[in-house]
Amino acid sequence: KSRLYFAVTVLMCAFVSINGVGLNDLLERASQLSDKLHSLSTSLTNDLDSHFPPVGRVMMPRPSMCHTSSLQIPNDKDQALKVPEDELLSLARSLLLAWSDPLALLSSKASSLAHPERNTINSKTKELQDNINSLVPGLEHVVHKMGSSSDNLSSLPFYSNSLGQDKTSRLVNFHFLLSCFRRDSHKIDSFLKVLRCRAAKKRPEMC
């Protein structure tokens, strides 16, 4: 855990002063941060699964209920390789920005979850927030380097400010939101790695 936190902190600091940094390096740093996002969300999911009530599986909403499910995106890497760079970057940014409010909600509720690993879950959720807060401005710099439009984003509003009225509902909805984020973080990571590969002029089969 401490090694992961140190690595994330170093990557965050790398985005603080990036004037003059080339596109390849910016995308490399962004890809490393997005990889950490996905790894951390996977670790959090495993923590939750360690003590998750059987009834929670029944109560869990379907993936199609994720607030980002309406966004039309490539289904796999082969499809992503056919999408123009500026569109792929806009998709990654749209997904990332869509998680600002949901992650703030998760972070505010993690410490009160009815779960024996809530302290660990709380700590990792705050790390997720820190990662997001670093990656968002990092991608803004990528936008400027690529000469893309910074306004070409999809609106994916999140309307809830509660996880539920009872401890089981709160745990289930926390898990559901996290599973949605884990799925989206994988997409963000995949899109940024394709962009990094293209910027490095690699052949598609090498990406």
Swiss-Prot record:
GO terms for biological process: positive regulation of cell population proliferation; positive regulation of receptor signaling pathway via JAK-STAT; response to nutrient levels. It is found in: Secreted. Residues 1-20 form the signal peptide. Keywords: Disulfide bond, Hormone, Secreted, Signal. PROSITE patterns: SOMATOTROPIN_1, SOMATOTROPIN_2. One of its GO terms (molecular function) is hormone activity. One of its GO terms (cellular component) is extracellular space. Its main location: secreted. Disulfide bonds join C66-C180, C197-C207. Transmembrane segments: none annotated. Pituitary gland. Belongs to the somatotropin/prolactin family. PANTHER family: PROLACTIN, SOMATOTROPIN,PROLACTIN. This is Prolactin.
